[in-house]
Amino acid sequence: NEENNFILSKSGLVIKYNYLNKIKEYKINYDEIETYLKEEYKMDDIVIPVLTPTKRNLNKYKNKKLIALTFDDGPSNNTKYFIKELQKRDALVTFFVVGNRVKKYEDVLKEAYLMGNQIGSHTYSHKNLLYLNEEEITKEIEKTNEAIYNVIGTKPTIIRVPYGNINKKIRSISNMNHILWNVDTLDWKYKNSNRVYKEIIKHAEDGNIILLHDIFKTSVNGVLKAIDELKKQGYEFVTIDEMVYLKNIKLDKSKTYFNFK
């Protein structure tokens, strides 16, 4: 049984479905269906996304060595290719997206989410929250959450603040779970796929959270090579939510998480 997902907007009804592990879609123009809609579903410019992501059977990952690969600053032109390659490898990751990039890449964000990848917040414009007042911090977080909601139909529950700069005030204002990292590949600095590969292999340990950026093609290439190697060593690649579930951890919004060891 394939699960159907639909997005209803003023432009029409788009039905997305998984067929032979590929996301297909069928579109009906709004003016063709408006007569048949209940009043509460008729709209002007309101978008109501209803998406159901693929859920893996996590039982097969119990007692496995788990790594959470996390990607900041996207989505980007590399993301579509990347998620398709991840799918071939039965690997899922977490994307901490920048809110002001969501609209431009909404199609790939939907596809990533439908495949089972997790979407988190990286704030709206990547400002250092330590230097913002309460109103500005709130705006950075809420605008991102709304942007993500308008695309996938649910708000993120996890956030990674820019530069990893976090304090008690930011945690309190956000009311979200804060995920940082314990392995920084410095992929943004060197932009070298072989170095990315070596850093991931070098720091591969159960429970690690690895920081990367899918805006760089070198990062994408290095990651895919590392996944292929580490799969041979018995590692599995999971989202933050999957990691938390498999390790039976209850997240606390008053804490900041660097790994799940």
Question: Model-predicted segments: where are they?
Answer:
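Compositionally biased intrinsically disordered regions enriched in Thr/Gly
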Residues: N1-I67, Y81, R89
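Alpha-helical scaffold elements lining the catalytic groove of polysaccharide deacetylases
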Residues: L114, K127-T154, N165-D206, S219-N221, ...
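Generic enzyme active-site microenvironment
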Residues: T70, G120, R160, L211-L212
